[in-house]
Amino acid sequence: MAAVVVMTGCSVMAPQYSASIDNVQKLKDSGDYSAKVGAFTSKPGQGNVNPISLRGSSMNSPYQSSYAKYVEEAIKQELSLANKMAPNANAEVSGTLLKNDLDSSGFSTGTGDIEARFVVKKQGQILYDQVKSAHHEWPSSFAGAVAIPRAIQEYPNLVQKLLASLYADPAFLSALK
């Protein structure tokens, strides 16, 4: 099946986000607060294309065909699982996706890079505005039939790393309280 997808150069869907247990635990351990998730947008530009090109195939987001919505959904899942999500919370997390790319062209290694600006507001006042980024590498192959499915499979791990860097920032967690 993967070989057929690769050879036809068609469009594939990124896997739905699966929350990181470590990220959820970090949110649980970060104190008493609740937050809601606002809109995430995407700033078009080099290194932030939609869909993502993978050796002639293209990968789309399962969330309204938007990778900004992918990051938004990821934060919603992790806040919900940590019992920190509340639709009427004062603190609102929103953001802008600045960079989002996978490279499956390497002979033995695939890479991914993602960068986003995260904003926390309370009653219209910005309490946090920072750019976070993540880089992820995985074993790959020269053979497209191996490299492309592997890159697709690794995308959620890239987003998990981005959110881990956000949750590791004490200023972000403090802004939520």
Residue ranges and their predicted role:
Residues 42-44, 114-119, 154-159:
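Short alpha-helical linear motifs
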Residues 51-64, 125-168:
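Short secondary-structure boundary motifs at beta->alpha junctions and helix caps
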Residues 76, 80-84, 102, 163-171:
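Sec-exported extracytoplasmic/periplasmic mature domains
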